[in-house]
């Protein structure tokens, strides 16, 4: 049994109401419920955590190492483009991770084109809406079974 951690950054708690033309109509709770069921169907466990505070996400990454988390799925939200601290935390715990974005950040404003995580992520999935989370979990399951 593998243990997965889904991390969501700032403003993702507003999913379902925030700019649905960009982010879709599903709530974060619905996405998390779907992923927990998907993990369970494969005999695994998925925990989720969302915060608008950078330090809380960093602390959750640190705790993941002590808890034996095998793989992290992360939608860092706006911290994608700003957070060296989150990058350093992920590198520090050496847990493989996939970066997920609901929208295609490269089709949006230029300031969203830079990611501090993509070059150290195991993979990046973007622009596929909530389905991107499910695809990321499928990939993480495959990669943990392979190792």
Curated annotation (Swiss-Prot):
The keyword Transmembrane helix appears for this protein: no
Catalytic activity field: 3-dehydroquinate = 3-dehydroshikimate + H2O
Assembly behavior: Homododecamer.
Source species of the chain: Thioalkalivibrio sulfidiphilus (strain HL-EbGR7)
Site (Transition state stabilizer) location in chain: 18
A single MF term (Gene Ontology): 3-dehydroquinate dehydratase activity
Keywords of this entry: Amino-acid biosynthesis, Aromatic amino acid biosynthesis, Lyase
Name the UniProt record assigns to this protein: 3-dehydroquinate dehydratase
EC identifiers of the protein: 4.2.1.10
One GO-annotated biological process of the protein: chorismate biosynthetic process
NCBIfam families in UniProt: aroQ, PRK05395.1-1, PRK05395.1-2, PRK05395.1-3, PRK05395.1-4
Keyword set includes Lyase: yes
Gene behind this protein: aroQ
Residues of the active site: 23 (proton acceptor), 101 (proton donor)
């Amino acid at each position: 049994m593998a243990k997965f951690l889904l991390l969501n950054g700032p403003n993702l708690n507003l999913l379902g109401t925030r700019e649905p033309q960009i982010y879709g109509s599903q709530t974060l709770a619905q996405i998390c419920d779907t992923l927990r069921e998907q993990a369970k169907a494969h005999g695994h466990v998925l925990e989720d955590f969302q915060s608008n505070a950078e330090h809380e996400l960093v602390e959750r990454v640190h705790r993941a190492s002590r808890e034996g988390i095998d793989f992290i799925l992360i939608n860092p939200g706006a911290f994608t483009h700003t957070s060296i601290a989150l990058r350093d935390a992920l590198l520090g715990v050496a847990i493989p991770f996939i970066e997920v974005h609901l929208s295609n950040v490269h089709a949006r404003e230029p300031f969203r084109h830079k990611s501090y995580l993509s070059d150290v992520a195991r993979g990046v999935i973007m622009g596929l809406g909530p389905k991107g989370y499910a695809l990321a979990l499928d990939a993480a399951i495959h990669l943990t079974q392979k190792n």
